[in-house]
Each structure stands twice: as C-alpha cells, then as structure tokens.
C-alpha cells in the first residue's frame, strides 16, 4: 500500500501537505492572495516546496507562480477547477495607480507609507475623470456627490486589493495609511528595454490600457519574443462588478 502511494505522491510533496503551514497557505492562495517575503514563514514554506506544490496545483489546472519580484500566487488556466479572482474596472485602475506610486520617488521620501486620500488624488490627477465616473456607473457630471461616491468606491477597491495581499495597513485598521507590496507589479505596464518604467506606467493609466502580469524587471531582463499574458487572463475582468467583494 505504501509503495503504491509513493508512486502517486512524492515524499517531499507529502511532507509539504503534512506541514502545519499548508492549510492556511493553501487557503490564502486559493482565495487569490499574493504571498511575499513580508510573510516570512509562509514565504519560506513556498520557496522550499515550490516545485512539488506547483505539480500539486496543476492537477487543478492552475500554476503556482513565483514572480521576478519574488512573491507567489496562483495563475488559473481556462479550465481551472479553482475559482478565479474577479476584479472590476476600477479595481484594475486603482491597482495600476498603486504600481505607479510604488515606482515613484515619493515612496522613498515617505518611507513607503501612503494614504487612501493620496491614491484618490493621484487617480483624479492621472486618469480621465469622465472615464472614472463611467467605470463606477456614475453619471459623468463631476458633481461633489459623484466624487464622494467615487471616493467610496476607491476605498472599497483598496480594501479588495488589501485582501489580495497587495497592500498592508499601517497603524489602526481605519487609519487610511498603508504600504504597497511588490505584488502590485501584477498591474505593471509592459515596458520594452530602455523605456522609463514610471512614464510607461503613467501612459498605462492615462490610456486605460490592459495591464500585463509580467513585471517591468522581467520585461527588461527577458529577450524572448513570446507575448506577455494580459491581466485579464490572470484577474478575470467583470464589467458589472462593483468595487467591493
């Protein structure tokens, strides 16, 4: 019986599944969460058993990806047996702004800490206001009431991205302050060698183009000619979904 079992599952995969960290890590990955180096134990666990767990998840038609920046996440295939993370248009746009802020000089000047208000202001500054209001199904009048509703949607979008492991609250839960994780590079612009990454991300926000899940660093370091996979294949896009889950 044991010999037959060993033919089906490797000793190292069995050790990974038996590890007390596995249930929590597995649940987080399946929920769409990104696990970076900030989570020391969980990250070390995934790094130690990456190959074995990737084979395990491929049985569900998903891949365990380790991004160039180091964070782990599950990338579903079209035939996935695990539910996909569905992001609204506004959540995608807020994610792109977070990536822009991560690349900005202000991140170092502010010790990596940003506020919800800064994201909202940057969003209004960088993106077309009419497109923003349309993205949240509001009339494009630009009234104070519309902007208030938009601000609420932005807060909800940030909450969703926080649950996906893309930002971390600083201080009190309702402080409005947070740090940005490297996993926001899931929203990074596709940049060819020699391009300014900040300018490229700025163009992405202004043009409202689809982002790619490949990081800027990977684009610069990789010489192959394969097309980058669009975010819509990783984060399923839903026109009708609002900002909150």
UniProtKB/Swiss-Prot annotation:
Main location, first listed in the record:
cytoplasm
- What top-level branch of life does the organism fall under? Bacteria
Q: Which InterPro entries does the entry link to?
A: MukE_C, MukE_N, Scp_MukE
> Keyword annotations for this protein?
Cell cycle, Cell division, Chromosome partition, Cytoplasm, DNA condensation
Q: Which GO terms describe its cellular component?
A: cytoplasm; nucleoid
Q: Name one GO biological process term.
A: chromosome segregation
Where does the record place the region Disordered? Answer: 213-245
Location(s) in or outside the cell: Cytoplasm, Nucleoid
Q: Which Pfam families match?
A: MukE
Q: Which Gene3D superfamilies does the annotation name? A: 1.10.10.2250, MukE-like family, C-terminal domain
Compositionally skewed regions (Acidic residues) per UniProt:
224-245
The entry assigns this protein to a family as follows: Belongs to the MukE family.
What does the protein in this record do?
Involved in chromosome condensation, segregation and cell cycle progression. May participate in facilitating chromosome segregation by condensation DNA from both sides of a centrally located replisome during cell division. Probably acts via its interaction with MukB and MukF.
What does the subunit comment say? Interacts, and probably forms a ternary complex, with MukF and MukB. The complex formation is stimulated by calcium or magnesium.
- Name the record gives this protein: Chromosome partition protein MukE
Q: What organism is recorded for this protein?
A: Actinobacillus succinogenes (strain ATCC 55618 / DSM 22257 / CCUG 43843 / 130Z)
